[in-house]
Every structure is written in structure tokens, then in C-alpha cells.
């Protein structure tokens, strides 16, 4: 075996011993690098006589090609081994049972509605339900809303087919109609007591659900949720409203130092009326007054439309937006995110 054959054999053995691509590149440098043994042989050709240079150069090139071939074969072998190891690591056992699709979770607004119902349920409030397509009487007239009130216009309300000119049908603009329906049924149930001059059990109810208005922007949607509350009895005062709603807000936001403010306002169905603001004492919203609800003492005309004597029965009502409460609770700035159906966004609340 001559010198060049020994060189090729040494390169093959060293390449075969290389366990990683890095080891192989280090071995390559010893033979084909700038200071490698083959490179040195090629540089030495310049010192040979012309007659010998041609034959010697051809022999060195043959050895170089053999070394490069051995190098490429080892590279491919290492790549194949790496791929095989990766495939084995990622191999699927087809005898295993299939993976079940992950279960979904409740929508963040649904979580808020459940929380609201739970808190008021602990205070003795019932939960009312009712139709989303409502009559003009339950949605407006029974709630002391004047015929010329702007809320009755098509610019604010979605009217639907099926009604008459004197009794149109519409998508309810608030959940107050459910309160009226609940109160009317409650009064019918206890009519015998009322006729006998006996006290009727108090009406305590909340009415959560979807409502509809002609509106759409970052903080409003044509479909939104609302939850209204009603407490009617013989000795229910504005003080009770403050106690109940303060307890609710502090429980909902888990903040015992939450501050509430009642600002004078106007609603057709309550008198006096007040907007309710809250103020957090810490966190990113600390120090700001944030409107969360409207409220007031139920107007005598509304009490009368329930079938009760407003001289004897009195109470309070409030209305809040669960969507708004959800935004405040989770720090979301755009209401439309809740209804775009983006799983990436909604999955954060599961």
C-alpha cells in the first residue's frame, strides 16, 4: 500500500469513527482543510519537476476524490441516522385510542351571567325568563315610556313583522319586560291575599338576557346582554337599593373597599332615578369613576301596571350590562371581541 492509499484509508477510518456532524467536520479539516494533509500534498506539487508533476498530481486528485466520496457517504449516513431517530421518537402507536377533541368552555359573558345569578340568588332573588320578541306594551307602555319617546323610533329599536299598527312587535330593547311579566304572574298568583287585604310576598327578581338596539361601535353592539333587578314590597326603600347593589358589586369584583356613587338621573320607569358608578381603590382602573348601572325607585305607573296599588307597594329597580361588567372584570377594551368568535381570544377565559 503506497502513501496515497494509506492516506485514503486513514481518512475513511476517521470519518467512520465520527459520531456527529461536528466530529465529521473536524475530521474533514485534517484532510481537506486549508492546512489538511491533501492540501499540503497539492501545494507540494509546485516543487516537483514538470515530468513528475503531471502523474503525481493525477494520483493526488484521485486520492482527494476518494476522500471526498467517503466524506459525503458518512454525511449521508449521519443524516439518515438522525432522521430515523427523529421518526422513531415521533412514531405513533396506531393501536392507541384516538385523541378526543378538547371540550369547550363557557363564553366569558356566560360566566358573568352565572356569577350574577349566583350572587343575587344568595340574596333571595328569583331569575326570570321571557321572550326576546316582545310586544310594544310590555317593552314600552307598561314601563311608563311615552308614545313620543325617542326609544320607540326605528332609529333605536328593531321592529319585526307579525304585529299590528296598534300593537307592534319588536326585539326587546331591555330585559324590563321580563320583570313586568314576572310581577304580573306573581300578583295573579297571590290575588286572593291582596283581595283579602293580606300582605303579598315580596317580589324579588332579576332578569338577565339578550337585548337589541340599533347601535354598533367599540363599546356598543346591536345585540348585547342586560340584567335588570326588581324588588317590590310594602316597605322597600332607596336605602335597600344601595345596600343590595353595594353588596353585589363588592362580591362580583371581590373588592371590599370598592366605592359606589349614586348620581341623579332620569328614567321613565323610576322616580327618583340614579346612575351608579364604581371606583376601584387599586389596580389599573384605580381612582376612576366607572358607570355600571342605572337604578331608581319604581314609578307608581309601573307599579300600577303590575296590578298593584302604588300607595301600598313600593320598590326599586336597577339595570346593568353584563358585557360591561365582563370588560371591567377581565380588562377588555373592545366589546366586539366577545362576539367575533375568535377562539384564540375566547379560550383565555376557559
UniProtKB/Swiss-Prot annotation:
Protein's recorded name: Phenylalanine--tRNA ligase alpha subunit
Coiled-coil ranges per the record? Answer: none
Q: Which residues cross the membrane?
A: none
Q: What is its main location?
A: cytoplasm
Q: Which GO terms describe its cellular component?
A: cytoplasm
The opening ranks of the lineage are:
Bacteria, Pseudomonadati, Pseudomonadota, Betaproteobacteria, Burkholderiales
InterPro entries cross-referenced by the UniProt entry: aa-tRNA-synth_II (IPR006195), aa-tRNA-synth_II/BPL/LPL (IPR045864), Phe-tRNA-synth_IIc_asu (IPR004529), Phe-tRNA_ligase_II_N (IPR004188), Phe_tRNA_ligase_alpha1_bac (IPR022911), Phenylalanyl-tRNA_Synthase (IPR002319), tRNA-bd_arm (IPR010978)
This protein's assembly is summarised as: Tetramer of two alpha and two beta subunits.
Example GO BP: phenylalanyl-tRNA aminoacylation
The family note in this entry says: Belongs to the class-II aminoacyl-tRNA synthetase family. Phe-tRNA synthetase alpha subunit type 1 subfamily.
Gene Ontology molecular functions: ATP binding; magnesium ion binding; phenylalanine-tRNA ligase activity; tRNA binding
Annotated Mg(2+) binding lies at 271
Q: Name one Pfam family in it.
A: tRNA-synt_2d
Kindly report, in one word, the top-level EC class recorded for this enzyme.
ligase
Free-text cofactor note:
Binds 2 magnesium ions per tetramer.
Q: What is its EC number?
A: 6.1.1.20
UniProtKB keywords: Aminoacyl-tRNA synthetase, ATP-binding, Cytoplasm, Ligase, Magnesium, Metal-binding, Nucleotide-binding, Protein biosynthesis
Q: Which cofactors?
A: Mg(2+)
Record SUPFAM superfamilies? Class II aaRS and biotin synthetases (SSF55681), tRNA-binding arm (SSF46589)
Its domain of life? Bacteria
List the PANTHER family hit by this protein, alphabetically.
PHENYLALANINE--TRNA LIGASE, MITOCHONDRIAL (PTHR11538:SF41), PHENYLALANYL-TRNA SYNTHETASE (PTHR11538)
* Keyword rRNA-binding among UniProt keywords: no
Q: Which Gene3D superfamilies match?
A: Bira Bifunctional Protein, Domain 2
